[in-house]
Amino acid sequence: MLKREMNIADYDAELWQAMEQEKVRQEEHIELIASENYTSPRVMQAQGSQLTNKYAEGYPGKRYYGGCEYVDIVEQLAIDRAKELFGADYANVQPHSGSQANFAVYTALLEPGDTVLGMNLAHGGHLTHGSPVNFSGKLYNIVPYGIDATGHIDYADLEKQAKEHKPKMIIGGFSAYSGVVDWAKMREIADSIGAYLFVDMAHVAGLVAAGVYPNPVPHAHVVTTTTHKTLAGPRGGLILAKGGSEELYKKLNSAVFPGGQGGPLMHVIAGKAVALKEAMEPEFKTYQQQVAKNAKAMVEVFLERGYKVVSGGTDNHLFLVDLVDKNLTGKEADAALGRANITVNKNSVPNDPKSPFVTSGIRVGTPAITRRGFKEAEAKELAGWMCDVLDSINDEAVIERIKGKVLDICARYPVYA
């Protein structure tokens, strides 16, 4: 018989210690990785629930197992909330990740070998948008598009590539682009050649939900997102659409199950339902507005301190700092900031002379610090500290001084109070 008082600490001290150390790390480090965020205790409660015990292959009302009457309610709540939040008339909440949601879209809309137009990874795209090491690059004929000299999407080149290569699908979306995408323009280009427009809004879904960033759902044939990142829910994926045919929606459902997955993770779907409800609250909109304000505030300081920011600014939650002129690599910057308890990720910049394992830039995002309660003043102070470290990358005294400031501000703004 299982007893509810069973716990990891008493049973597996080695594992528990690592878990506790990670908890301390999150509280004592400033998190600036653009794809990371802190989810609410309500979401974690759902993920740690007995829903983890239930197999539920199929969809609500059409399961392959019995005993699904309550998990049907859970999944339907998540579906309905996703549709309401993003103005969609179709939602699939089962994908285990954003990449698996993207895989489902590819398999629903395309045949292996079909031509796809996707954003160049080196210009801000994502692995699943056509990287040769990913399924997308291995199974499909990928034609990349990118940004112009100003750091913004080159729509003229995109249109030229589309007319020349006649892709079956055009992908909008990014993992390291700080501008606003013109979804209507992308749909116009897709329609001109009879292609699908598929948008991966994983990075900006929270901003979209709050009305801070344009919603791609009215423009795209299909939209995917993760449920973490700016949306601040559990790690998982989501597929959305509006105005599509029943045939399209059946194809998408079949591409998720049984096409790419078996049983859904019902405890995660419950977490998604909680997060989607939280995203409808007025304070969520305030939070997302602050995310964007904090990113702009940080950019201002980097520019004042003589650092180059790709595209010269940001209109969302992230920005790229180009370190080529500073004779620094992203790897060096990442490591030095890490020693000061500031977590970023090294990132390739446009026309990067370094390999993806070294890079010439860092990506900075504000969802996590804003979740802690940082506003513009704290964001600017933090950006100044980062510049101090990068200006003196081999000076351990400077790094230790900044680390002390980081520990102090983390104590004042805990993740979980």
Swiss-Prot record:
Recorded consequence of changing residue 55 to F: 50 and 15-fold increase in the affinity for serine and tetrahydrofolate, respectively, and 4-fold decrease in the catalytic efficiency
Residues the record lists as binding glycine: 35, 65, 363
Entry's Gene Ontology molecular function annotations: glycine hydroxymethyltransferase activity; identical protein binding; L-allo-threonine aldolase activity; protein homodimerization activity; pyridoxal phosphate binding; zinc ion binding
Positions of (6S)-5,6,7,8-tetrahydrofolate binding: 121, 125-127, 246, 355-357
Impact when changing residue 218 to A: No significant difference in catalytic efficiency and affinity compared to the wild-type
Chain positions of site Transaldimination and stability: 55, 235
Keywords: Acetylation, Amino-acid biosynthesis, Cytoplasm, One-carbon metabolism, Pyridoxal phosphate, Transferase
Annotated site residue numbers, Plays an important role in substrate specificity: 228
PTM-bearing positions, type N6-(pyridoxal phosphate)lysine: 229
Pathway annotation: One-carbon metabolism; tetrahydrofolate interconversion; Amino-acid biosynthesis; glycine biosynthesis; glycine from L-serine: step 1/1
Positions of pyridoxal 5'-phosphate binding: 55, 99, 175, 203, 228, 235, 263
Phenotype when changing residue 372 to K: No significant difference compared to the wild-type
One CC-aspect GO term: membrane
Catalytic reaction list: (6R)-5,10-methylene-5,6,7,8-tetrahydrofolate + glycine + H2O = (6S)-5,6,7,8-tetrahydrofolate + L-serine; L-allo-threonine = acetaldehyde + glycine; (6R)-5,10-methenyltetrahydrofolate + H2O = (6S)-5-formyl-5,6,7,8-tetrahydrofolate + H(+)
N6-acetyllysine modifications at: 54, 250, 285, 354, 375
CDD domains attached to this UniProt entry: SHMT (cd00378)
Extent of the signal sequence: none
Principal place of residence: cytoplasm
Induction: By CsgD.
PTM annotation (N6-succinyllysine): residues: 62, 242, 250, 277, 293, 331, 346, 354
Substitution effect: residue 258 to A: Important decrease in affinity and catalytic efficiency. Reduced thermal stability
Cofactor: pyridoxal 5'-phosphate
Highest taxon in the source lineage: Bacteria
Family: Belongs to the SHMT family.
Protein name as it appears in the record: Serine hydroxymethyltransferase
Protein encoded by which gene: glyA
